[in-house]
Amino acid sequence: MEYYEQEEYATVTSAPPKRPAGRTKFRETRHPVYRGVRRRGPAGRWVCEVREPNKKSRIWLGTFATAEAAARAHDVAALALRGRGACLNFADSARLLRVDPATLATPDDIRRAAIELAESCPHDAAAAAASSSAAAVEASAAAAPAMMMQYQDDMAATPSSYDYAYYGNMDFDQPSYYYDGMGGGGEYQSWQMDGDDDGGAGGYGGGDVTLWSY
């Protein structure tokens, strides 16, 4: 029995859940796509709880084997608590629900109907794959800044390969032709100032030529 038209509801596609701003030091367990769903323990099980409108209390709906089952349970509670103002994880949850959400008056009634829908609804393998892919993308995005910082630290601690290639083969204990020439003797000065090398034409040799001659 259809109590509401499924297209009248907002979904996580049209109104995605808000993510907390800034960096957090705790491990994120909430599902990146589905509302009211979070991971519990290393076994990979999923739990669902919803906050009652205008209250601080929450309604515990249970632990489920898949994130999709927990997301279905959330939809039942959202329909019961918020009516047409509910934001659903799946657009067809209202159509698949076998009871009128308005009749779910107590937390026990909501929990019972939520578990029934979660267990009876066929879980789409494509939806499960998309959920896993979204979680992997989020984990990769969170790890990227740490990887970049590690890369920068490694680059700062490693000497430049160019500097090593240029200076690594120089023997600083050997005489330097450059500094020998600057000292006023040696091969460098003889080669630079000897005019006989170019026949005395066009060079600095070929006679007594001084700087002030120009």
Curated annotation (Swiss-Prot):
Gene Ontology molecular-function annotations: DNA binding; DNA-binding transcription factor activity
Ranges where the record places region Disordered: 1-24
Gene3D superfamilies in UniProt: AP2/ERF domain (3.30.730.10)
Domain of life, source organism: Eukaryota
CDD domains: AP2
Key words, A-Z: Activator, DNA-binding, Nucleus, Stress response, Transcription, Transcription regulation
Coiled-coil portions: none
Protein localization: Nucleus
GO CC terms in record: nucleus
Residues within the DNA-binding region(s): 33-91
Major localization class: nucleus
Matches recorded under Pfam families: AP2
Reported function: Transcriptional activator that binds specifically to the DNA sequence 5'-[AG]CCGAC-3'. Binding to the C-repeat/DRE element mediates high salinity- and dehydration-inducible transcription.
Stated family: Belongs to the AP2/ERF transcription factor family. ERF subfamily.
PANTHER family given in the database record: DEHYDRATION-RESPONSIVE ELEMENT-BINDING PROTEIN 1C, DEHYDRATION-RESPONSIVE ELEMENT-BINDING PROTEIN 1D
Protein name: Dehydration-responsive element-binding protein 1C
Species per Swiss-Prot/TrEMBL record: Oryza sativa subsp. indica
